[in-house]
């Protein structure tokens, strides 16, 4: 913990399942503009999260000597006040717990984010102390969007009001009040000041501005005795101070352990939940900067819910998403907060997600709850009502992606797609064939024979065109085909044609595709987005925005693709691939103690040492590894 080169890259995330979060490094030194102790949505201002309370510095005072446990990075590679040197232990199996030792003083800090409330709770316990001890708490306030910085200014309000064992304050109009309260009566000393030149090195690495000033209104001070606990709460609403200790205990009791790989992933899955005031339910695409996105929602939903026996949340999210997609199909303004719902593969992934639901419950149950929606989506596609998904006479779907990316490989540079996938997209048409066959099986289950035969006829047409269009002489699949232009790049999108329950490929063709994915794309962190043997391979995701955009889908490795790869392997080779897949899991399990603890980063460099990059926690990655673990267990028994 005292070695900053080792501790600063490790981050910690906790959420309230309603969009708010708390995030920093394990030594509480903020290294991103997205870091903060209390980061909450402020819908009255915009659709971004906002950092209200950046950090809380604690100072231990004995015999007039002060020992500040805080840590900030300032310009010029200066770290102050170096409180990390007092850390003796850190653990986050259930709740993040830090043990500080200052001379004869041992102070324990535990942190929990109250579910469904914008309230962070921190419990301090004086485990040992042989002299009179005082704690001083100095809050660092930001009151700004996660995408901006704050600087010293004359506009910020210095006003505050006393509340139960604390104060409330608000720096700018439009923001909610920030309540800072303690379980114990204390003295607040008003001495406003700006701490200037706080620096965030992760933003420097990403080519962005990286400096800001933070406002400190003063400090709280109180005595603490050996064995005593004090609970601090920061929130957008007031709470009775006398209830804080019981509330902390209650929240801890509700937490499940993070004592193994599976439990870490389950906890990570819950962090993507978002419940809004109208009871709409969502899946966030990732932390700390992603919002809810349609494609991510449908890909991640089965793994984040069905694979951990949480069918109820699947149904709640699907209810919200269906409402939004019906609005889109009907040409109405979309009322739900799901971005990119117009993307052409979204309806295809929605049907795939419902296919997983049918396998978890039954086809009868799936048809009863979602049959009409599935029919409506199929008709929407067949009637060519989607603005960028055209069903052609050969049975394949055509998408225009020349000027605006329409697939998950959506990075742009200078206003143009970096990977201009256009025409017949391989995974779109694998999804379409799978959807047609699945819908035909649903129709058969409920006795709709005419519908079944029509769907099967459409599927047969699509199958033949798929083979004629995508299968090349080397045994793998073109990534996309547009007229006479065939993209020969070896990319992972062909893995879906092997992994899906219904595939136009024969067993031998599947094996050929899987083999080339294994040889050229497989890494310990998922499948590369491009083979090293293909032109334009760029496996390291670092540098300014444009540099990263060019690398985003040109060789970086993605764990969620690894999930589909493992599914394809198990379906083709059954139990003979169990030990191989178990070894693959080691690469993901290692991530539980790297980068953001207990979860999986967005993407990884395509070359050793396969460093984690991008968002610190990514829903599709967590979901697909959970789904692969479930599949692994099924094939073991």
PLM ranges: what are they?
Residues 1-257, 261, 288, 310, ...:
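Terminal accessory carbohydrate-recognition/targeting modules of carbohydrate-active enzymes
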Residues 68-95, 102-106, 383, 515-525, ...:
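Non-catalytic C-terminal accessory modules of carbohydrate-active enzymes
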Residues 119, 191-223, 228, 328-349, ...:
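The feature captures the catalytic groove of carbohydrate-active enzymes
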Residues 137-140, 354-356, 373:
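Transmembrane beta-barrel strand/turn architecture of Gram-negative outer membrane proteins
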Residues 250-287, 316, 530-537:
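Conserved oxyanion/phosphate-binding beta-strand-loop segments in alpha/beta enzyme cores
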Residues 265-278, 308-330, 372-391, 404-406, ...:
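Long, well-ordered core segments of solenoidal/helical folds
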Residues 279-297, 335-336:
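Internal amphipathic alpha-helical repeat/solenoid segments
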Residues 290-321, 493-505, 514, 566-575, ...:
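Alpha-helical support elements that line or immediately flank enzyme active sites
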């Amino acid at each position: 913990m005292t070695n900053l080169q080792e501790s600063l890259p490790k981050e910690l995330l906790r959420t309230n399942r309603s969009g708010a979060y708390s995030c920093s490094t394990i030594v509480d030194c903020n290294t991103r503009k997205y870091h903060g102790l209390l980061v909450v949505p402020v819908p009255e201002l915009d659709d971004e999260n906002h950092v209200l309370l950046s950090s809380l510095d604690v100072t231990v005072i004995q015999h007039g000597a002060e020992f500040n446990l805080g840590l900030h990075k300032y310009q010029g590679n200066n770290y102050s006040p170096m409180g990390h040197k007092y850390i003796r232990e850190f653990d986050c199996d259930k709740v993040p717990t830090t043990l500080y030792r200052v001379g004869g003083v041992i102070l324990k800090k535990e942190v929990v984010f109250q579910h469904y409330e914008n309230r962070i709770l921190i419990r301090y316990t004086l485990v040992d102390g042989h002299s009179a001890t005082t704690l001083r708490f100095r809050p660092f306030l930001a009151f700004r969007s996660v995408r901006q910085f704050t600087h010293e200014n004359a506009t910020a309000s210095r006003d505050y009001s006393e509340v139960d064992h604390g104060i409330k304050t608000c720096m700018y109009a439009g923001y909610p009040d920030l309540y800072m309260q303690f379980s114990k009566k204390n003295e607040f000393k008003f001495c406003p000041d700006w701490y200037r030149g706080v620096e965030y090195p992760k933003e420097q690495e990403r080519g962005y501005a990286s400096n800001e000033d933070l406002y400190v209104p003063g400090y709280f001070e109180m005595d603490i005795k050996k064995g005593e606990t004090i609970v601090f709460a920061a929130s957008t609403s007031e709470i009775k101070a006398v209830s804080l200790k019981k509330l902390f205990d209650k929240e801890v009791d509700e937490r499940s352990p993070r004592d193994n790989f599976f439990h870490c992933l389950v906890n990570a899955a819950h962090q993507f939940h978002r419940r809004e005031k109208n009871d709409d339910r969502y899946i966030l695409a990732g932390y700390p900067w992603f919002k809810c996105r349609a494609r991510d929602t449908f890909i991640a939903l089965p793994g984040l819910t069905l694979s951990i026996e949480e069918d109820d949340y699947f149904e709640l999210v699907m209810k919200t998403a269906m409402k939004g997609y019906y609005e889109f199909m009907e040409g109405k303004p979309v009322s739900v907060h799901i971005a990119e719902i117009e993307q052409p593969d979204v309806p295809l992934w929605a049907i795939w997600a419902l296919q997983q639901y049918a396998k978890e419950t039954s086809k009868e149950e799936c048809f009863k709850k979602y049959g009409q929606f599935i029919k409506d989506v199929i008709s929407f596609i067949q009637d060519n009502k989607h603005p960028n998904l055209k069903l052609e006479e050969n049975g394949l779907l055509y998408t225009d992606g020349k000027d605006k990316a329409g697939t998950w490989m959506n990075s742009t540079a200078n206003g143009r797609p970096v990977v201009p996938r256009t025409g017949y997209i391989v995974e779109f048409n694998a999804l379409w064939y799978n959807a047609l066959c699945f819908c035909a099986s649903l129709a058969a289950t409920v006795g709709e024979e005419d519908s079944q035969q029509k769907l099967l006829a459409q599927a047969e047409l699509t199958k033949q065109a798929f083979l004629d269009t995508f299968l090349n002489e080397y045994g793998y699949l073109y990534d996309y085909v547009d007229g006479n232009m065939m993209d020969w790049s070896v990319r992972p999108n062909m893995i879906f044609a092997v992994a899906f329950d219904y595939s136009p490929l024969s067993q031998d063709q599947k094996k050929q595709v899987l083999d080339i994915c294994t040889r050229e794309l497989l890494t310990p962190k998922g499948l590369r987005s491009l083979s090293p043997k293909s032109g334009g391979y760029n496996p390291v995701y670092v540098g300014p925005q444009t540099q990263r955009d060019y690398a985003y889908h040109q060789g970086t490795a993605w764990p969620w693709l690894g999930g589909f790869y493992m599914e394809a392997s198990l379906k083709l080779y059954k139990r003979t691939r169990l030990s191989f897949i178990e070894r693959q899991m080691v690469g993901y399990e290692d991530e539980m103690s790297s980068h953001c603890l207990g979860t999986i980063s967005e993407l990884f460099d395509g070359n050793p040492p396969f460093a984690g990059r991008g968002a610190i926690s990514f829903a599709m990655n967590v979901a697909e590894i959970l789904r692969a673990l479930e599949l692994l267990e099924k094939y073991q028994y």
